[in-house]
């Protein structure tokens, strides 16, 4: 709106008759301030809808000086021509009646007198025509040369919000002829307008016209709005030129054209208003269509970020919802844990006395904090953590607290944040119990500050019971004790015995209540609830089946079908991978070769039995006198005897049962059978009785076959042996340990496999040593030598079967010789020594194996390690 300060006074003029203006008097015309030629004023409506309008001609002052304005000019209809400067888009806003041809009160910038009481004199038609012609000529010139400059000035003036500083419009002397021409055209138009009848406006139109007067120009917000304004002004200029060039059209047609123009202006103004609202939407659409969204920037690491994230984790866990729903825990795990995260609890430092049922196997679990072997612990993956959190708080846990020492935080090469606490205390709060665990905590965060690994290695834990639970029980127990003491002191007759009995019962009941209050059935030996441990056990089962589950998802098959097609794993330990088809075919070939070798060995054994009969006949003479003495062997020789002379007639089945019994119950009693200075431990050698089937010494090919498999072949021709004093088979003697090893392997396959490897190594070394010494009989079992004869015995690779070597200094064993003190006949053809005389072999059941002392010490250390592994196994678990 136009400011309301008083206008500058306008200079004197001449009176204009009302007949020229087509008016009959009316309300006084309100005064207006001076406006430049480039800015149109806001319209003002009076009582009679009178309006003031400033024309766009630069030389208006000459015209206004020759015209007089009456105080009241309702609906004045003076048509003004446009000047050379551009018209404002608001110049046609706010007309009343025939407002397209309505003239306004013209105020000259040069005038300084008062408007009221002054009138302009009449001008002649020639002067008006000259004025119009001059304006028309100037219009064409100024439109060509100053269009862009005038638009810029107008926009700056509108945006500035004021009209200050606008200079007056000067009249040039060369424009007189143009003014006369314009005056003639204007006079003709005035005559035509006087002939028009009065136009009656409807109330709706009047209201619309009043609303149009209040349209405000919005500031420019974009280049598109500026372009629309320029286009609007060009259209207005063209329309004004059309009005001047079409004087012969009917007033009705002119009114229709004017209404169309007004509608177009309103639409353009609405577009201009909507442009600021559309502007913020355009960059979003452009970004969605052309530019991809940038990924969120990773947070730059700063010291202390890991500890701060841990604080947020504990705070969020404490402020869980009351209903403890699973959806909250799923969101919690997704927010604070990585998709492949693991949470581990190590209890390796507790010792073997604690109950560790359901934890990981000892050979699989490994803790990088304590590095204890064997280790024990629990592990849960990110898929199980939501359910684990829910069960923990459902099983009685009210709150879980974490107390930590000074952190040690660092960032590794992969961008992960490692947070370590050398001292950490985790406390689980129950209703009547507190479980406090001391240990070390290590947390690994991913670059986006999500927990990748959580490891808590507990050293110990304490179960704390509140005093308020124990004080009543202790008080009751003390009062019962006092009553019992008083009753016992006052008991002088038999009538006091019932009272003593009642007090005693009360004392016992109070003690039981106290013991019950001290018990903590809520948690196990490790300080975890039963439901919590059960969930961890299920988690371990699921983790072990994860490969099968992934295989089922990849092949899109059902569980049963996937289990049938899933590659099986064979072997004593489940950790070993399954055999390939090529390995299976190789095993079949080896089995076939083994069967062929067994047949050949049976034939060789039959031949050797015949040769052995001659040896057994020579040894019968001295057998009865020395059998008992040699069965009860001297422990200083290092020979382990698991039986006495009375057990010589027992069968192999009873000995095998004894082996199993000793292996299961006597793991810790090996020291009773083994002397302290013996470098070997393990099972005692169980020998075959004379009544059992015996075989001859196998050939080297049979030994090679039986060493890796550690199994003794059975022979159907053994029953044909007529002699009861035949030498037992080496393989049969050596196989006495295999039933115990197989049954022990059922309990712990990994331990048995390690012992088998050591024994196989012993047998292979024996075979190599015996082959280098010329080939002699081989026996399996514990072995050792006397100090007197050890030097001579080690000089050959002979194993003494069925007896013990005499403590003779002249004992000499040769490939073709015999013992000293007797005549030995050599059987060089078969490599078997015929032993006669006082030093002949006894009918004992111990085979002595000759080895190098250094090799014996190494093998002894290996056997001791294997036995210690058996002893450390928790058989009660």
UniProtKB/Swiss-Prot annotation:
InterPro entries: LIM-bd/SEUSS. Pfam families: LIM_bind. Keywords: Coiled coil, Developmental protein, Differentiation, Flowering, Nucleus, Repressor, Transcription, Transcription regulation. It is found in: Nucleus, Nucleoplasm. One of its GO terms (molecular function) is DNA binding. Residues 1-42, 272-295, 560-599, 612-633, 666-753 are annotated as: Disordered. Forms a corepressor complex with LUG; LUG is the transcription repressor subunit and SEU the specific DNA-binding adapter. Interacts with AGL24-AP1 and SVP-AP1 dimers when complexed to SEU. Interacts with AP1/AGL7 and SEP3/AGL9. Binds to LUH. DNA-binding adapter subunit of the SEU-LUG transcriptional corepressor of the C class floral homeotic gene AGAMOUS during the early stages of floral meristem development. Is part of the A class cadastral complex that define the boundaries between the A and C class homeotic genes expression and function. Interacts together with APETALA2 and LEUNIG to repress AGAMOUS expression. In association with LUG, regulates petal shape through AGAMOUS-independent mechanisms. Controls cell division during petal development and enable the proper patterning of petal blade vasculature. This is Transcriptional corepressor SEUSS. It comes from Arabidopsis thaliana. The gene is SEU.
